[in-house]
Amino acid sequence: DGTAYLEEYNFKLLPGTGPYVIKDEDIVNQESYTVTKRDSWWREDHRTQMYMYNFDKVTISVVKDNPALQFEKLKKGEADAIVIRKPSIWVDETDFEAANKGWVQKRRVHSSVPAGTWGYAFNMRKWPFDDKRVRYAFSYLYDREKFNSEILYNEYALQNSLYSGSEYENQNNNKFEFNPSKAVELLKEAGYKVRNDRGYLVHEETNKELSFTIEVGKPAEYRVTPMQQILKEYGIDMQIKFVDPTTRWKNLMDRNFTIDFQGWGGLVYPNPETSFKSSLADQKNNNNVSGLKSERLDELLPIYDTEFDHARRVEIIQEIDGIVSDIHPSAWGLSREPPARLLYWDKFGYPDYMLTKYGGRFEDILYHWWFDTEKDKALQNAMKNNGSLPLGETEHTFWKDQ
């Protein structure tokens, strides 16, 4: 069953040929791990790797499901750089002494990384989301504009496609704007017309209460609780159960879930087969998490994979996007990747673009930045004398300006 393998190797790095190694003694279970650059890397002088991997040693702290703790470690100098994923921290809490004096720099780095999205994935294999009308009703009760303005500080954009903002987006997709009247109408069509003494809708034939459970990590609580409250107002009981990421992922891959709050990363070149091929729908451990099946999609997928004309490929993906939107295996929410929000102590050098065009991720720091001795001296001097350093522009728009 793999238990012996996991016990032996779960916290060991298998041999590889990359620029860094992780030594067994540099792994502190559940706390940190340190990568050390090889003395002589075989690909170091290759033209595609020049000026990369500039740090001799990097320690990565492990902070699970606690963005506030991650932020505090940065403020105390226990971390040199972090990405801020929670909008409220970025907007309300980054006005601290080190940031105001320029010791810690604050950047929103724009890139061309495909946005992706996050939202609610339905398990269409089982009740109640095996009924398309219930899936649609859920989406009509998903007040994304309100969530964005009141909870997410308008840091995100509404998504109505797997490929929002790109040429692949099907502009005819249903926008699913907040429409409680439409939701109630659909629920009645699905058989949910009256409420029980708890105030929740029950099916007219089975008398089954419209109630289900969503499993999330604690950091997602502030995003799903408002949805729970709206659903309750309209007679739907969504129970929230907090689980660790490992448990949630196992249940998702085993298809042991009813609804899941998740994110979908964007791709420069779409690869829909791994998520929507019908033969994957009833198998475990793949990306067709909702159990989507469509004969037309199965016809289009091999055509797309063997088509070399770009314009035609775009047409195919747009049709696929429309089919998926209509079947509605997920209630798409808001863009998953706004500009990267970075905080870092001002001791680093970096290329003009800061983060790569189609990566735009925190990990780019490890690949492309370097330790700047002169900057570090200036930082230490400013901290010693309670001085200030130049703040720099918060909005970093190198790729947008090209």
Question: Where are the regions that the model predicts?
Answer:
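Short, well-ordered beta-strand elements
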Residues: 18-23, 31-34, 55-62, 208-217, ...
